[in-house]
Amino acid sequence: MAAASAGATRLLLLLLMAVAAPSRARGSGCRAGTGARGAGAEGREGEACGTVGLLLEHSFEIDDSANFRKRGSLLWNQQDGTLSLSQRQLSEEERGRLRDVAALNGLYRVRIPRRPGALDGLEAGGYVSSFVPACSLVESHLSDQLTLHVDVAGNVVGVSVVTHPGGCRGHEVEDVDLELFNTSVQLQPPTTAPGPETAAFIERLEMEQAQKAKNPQEQKSFFAKYWMYIIPVVLFLMMSGAPDTGGQGGGGGGGGGGGSGR
């Protein structure tokens, strides 16, 4: 009997270990997958742990046309709301072109797909974009801030870029200061606008109606409440203000009789 009980216990433990093993493997795989993808997302969706990738592109052309190329990759953890960015270094040709665009007062543009994880423009549902004067980016030594605005569905609805410090003052910038971007990223979640106090108003109205139903006496008019006091007062005033017609008639008759005796 004891041997059978021990065998059943061992079998139960083996079953529990078999059930727990896949869940541990899934958890470790989620963490490992996130670390392995990292900066290599290239706009692809990180399937595990609620992390998605966004491709960051930029454009700066002499003729001010839009010709977007990859600048880096954004990694958005939708569970904790964190945003990270990995960027590549500008080539010598790109640094020279950026200087030329800045000298011509041209624009530096950035864009991000609206739908995280999209592979192309059609799947992305379009792009959101922003721009700054190229000269301000050059004089800031490629120091800028990107802010992503997202909605409740997890789509990107806007992006803004600002340089630190901003403005174009004509300062000389060495070529070594235009190799690496110094970028801070910020995620702007949706804000809930205050709605009308419809529920509170309805609740207050129902409470008032319930209170009136409990005290129907309060719904009566002033006359309905105090008629038993008002009617006697009105009758008293009517009786006290009426002329004494009987007394006046008796006096007139006596005077007439005296005159006829003479």
UniProtKB/Swiss-Prot annotation:
Pfam families per UniProt: ECM10 (PF21203)
Protein species of origin: Homo sapiens (Human)
Topological region Cytoplasmic: 243-262
Transmembrane regions: 222-242
Designated name of the protein: ER membrane protein complex subunit 10
Keyword hit for Transmembrane: yes
GO cellular component: EMC complex; endoplasmic reticulum membrane; extracellular region; membrane
Tissue specificity of this protein: Present in serum (at protein level). Increased expression seen in the left ventrice after myocardial infarction (at protein level). Expressed in the pituitary gland. Expressed in brain.
Residue intervals on the Lumenal side: 26-221
Quaternary state and interactors: Component of the ER membrane protein complex (EMC).
Superkingdom: Eukaryota
GO BP, one annotated term: tail-anchored membrane protein insertion into ER membrane
Alphabetical UniProt keywords: Angiogenesis, Endoplasmic reticulum, Glycoprotein, Intellectual disability, Membrane, Secreted, Signal, Transmembrane, Transmembrane helix
Function comment: Part of the endoplasmic reticulum membrane protein complex (EMC) that enables the energy-independent insertion into endoplasmic reticulum membranes of newly synthesized membrane proteins. Preferentially accommodates proteins with transmembrane domains that are weakly hydrophobic or contain destabilizing features such as charged and aromatic residues. Involved in the cotranslational insertion of multi-pass membrane proteins in which stop-transfer membrane-anchor sequences become ER membrane spanning helices.
Disease affiliated with this protein: Neurodevelopmental disorder with dysmorphic facies and variable seizures: An autosomal recessive disorder characterized by global developmental delay apparent in early childhood, mildly impaired intellectual development, speech delay, behavioral abnormalities, and non-specific dysmorphic facial features. Some patients may have seizures, brain imaging abnormalities, mild skeletal defects, and renal abnormalities.
Post-translational modification: Glycosylated.
